[in-house]
Amino acid sequence: MSFSQESGAHHHPQDYAGLSDEEDEIDILGEDDPCSLKSHFYLQPTHSVMGDSEMLSPSKLSCTESESDSSGESEGGTSKDSSTTPTGSKAKRTLVKPPYSYIALITMAILQSPHKKLTLSGICDFISSKFPYYKDKFPAWQNSIRHNLSLNDCFIKIPREPGNPGKGNYWTLDPASEDMFDNGSFLRRRKRFKRHQQEFFKDGLMMYNSLPYYRPYSAIQPQPVLQQTSLTCMAIPETLPMSTHLAPYPDIKRKVSYPAQGVHRGFKAQDADNHPNNSQSKCSFSIENIMRKPKEPEPNIQSFNSHWNYNHVFQRPSSCLLPAVLNLSTGPLLANTQGARQYNLIQFPGCY
C-alpha cells in the first residue's frame, strides 16, 4: 500500500509536469472553451501517463480539427460574403434621407433655374442629381412632389406658351412667399403660406404680358359697374316735368308734354287735324262750350305705347339710375342744355 501510494505520488508530479505545456496551449483558447473542459475532465491521477496521452490525443485532435473547421467555415463564410456582396450595397446603407421637406426641395429647384420656373420632370431631375438618396428611390417620391405642387398655395402653375412644345406645365413660386423660410434656411419653415383668393388667382394665367389673353400678375382691380360710354347713348328729353315729387301714374299722363321732335310723329299729325288755326276754336266763352266737356282726341295706340316707355325713368328702382346719369361729368350730350343743369337739382325720393 505504501508502494502504491509512493508510486502514485511519484508519478503524479511527472504527469502534471509532462502536460504542463498542453495545459498552457488549451488555456489559450479560453476558459469557457468546451475543449478545455474536456481536458480537465480527462486529467485524472488514477490513470497512467500513456493512457492519459492516448486518451487525450483524440480529444485534442478533435478539438483542433473542430477549431480549424469552425475557424475555416467562419473565415470562408466571411470571405465568401465579402466577395459576393457588392460595394454598392455598403454605399446604399450609408445613404441618409436629407432633412428637407418636399416644399423646400421644390423651392430649391425653382430658385436655381434661370427663368425661375420648372416643370415636374425638371424638379425631379434637380432633386435626383443633388441628393443620391432620392436618386436611388426615384419613382417612389415623384407623386409626392406632384401633390405638393398642387396642394400648396406657394406654387403657381403656368401654362406653356403657344409655340413652346413640351409636356407638362411650368411651376413657379408666388412672389409673396419669399419669406416662407427662416433667414433663407430651408430646414425650417415659418408658417404655411396661404394666398387670399380675392386678391390673386390660383392658377396663374398672368405671367405673359405679351399675349392678349393673359393679364399681368397683380391684384384684381374692381371694374366700375356703370361706364360713361354706355350711358351716353341714353337720351333724356328736355321736356320732362320739373316737379320735385313723383306724381301718380294718371297725373303723369296729363303733365308730360309731348316732345317737339322725336319719334312721336303720330301725335303731331293728330294735333294738327284736331286743332285748326283759328282763334275762335281756341277762345270760345259760350255757355255751351263751358257746360260741355271738350272731347279729347284719341291718340295712336302704337305711338302712345312708344311714348309712355319713358315712364320706366320714374318707376322704382329704375328711377334711381337717373341721378347717376345726371351727376356724371357734363358730357357732350347734356353739356349745353339748360334742362340738364336743372335736372341736377332734382331730388328723387326713394333713391338711396
Curated annotation (Swiss-Prot):
Pfam families: Forkhead
Function: Transcriptional repressor with a role in dorsal axis formation and neural plate expansion; maintains an undifferentiated neural ectoderm after neural induction.
Induction conditions: Strongly by siamois, moderately by cer1 and weakly by wnt8 and nog.
SMART domains on file: FH (SM00339)
Taxonomic lineage of the native organism: Eukaryota, Metazoa, Chordata, Craniata, Vertebrata
Biased composition (Acidic residues): 20-32
UniProt KW Transcription keyword: yes
Membrane-spanning intervals of the chain: none
Top-level taxon of origin: Eukaryota
Chief place of localization: nucleus
Any GO MF annotation of the entry: DNA-binding transcription factor activity
DNA-binding region ranges: 97-191
InterPro entries: Fork_head_dom, FOX_domain-containing, TF_fork_head_CS_1, TF_fork_head_CS_2, WH-like_DNA-bd_sf, WH_DNA-bd_sf
GO cellular component: nucleus
Region (Disordered): 1-32, 54-92
Protein localization: Nucleus
Tissues expressed in: Maternal expression is localized to the animal hemisphere of the cleavage embryo. In pre-gastrula embryos, zygotic expression begins in the presumptive neural ectoderm. During gastrulation, expression is confined to the superficial layer of cells in the dorsal blastopore lip (Spemann organizer). Also expressed at a lower level in the paraxial mesoderm but not in the notochord. Expression is subsequently lost until after neural tube closure when expression re-initiates in the tailtip within the entire neural tube and paraxial mesoderm, but not in the notochord.
Single Gene Ontology BP annotation: negative regulation of DNA-templated transcription
Annotated keywords: Developmental protein, Differentiation, DNA-binding, Neurogenesis, Nucleus, Repressor, Transcription, Transcription regulation
Gene label: foxd5-a
Biased composition (Low complexity): 73-85
Protein's recorded name: Forkhead box protein D5-A
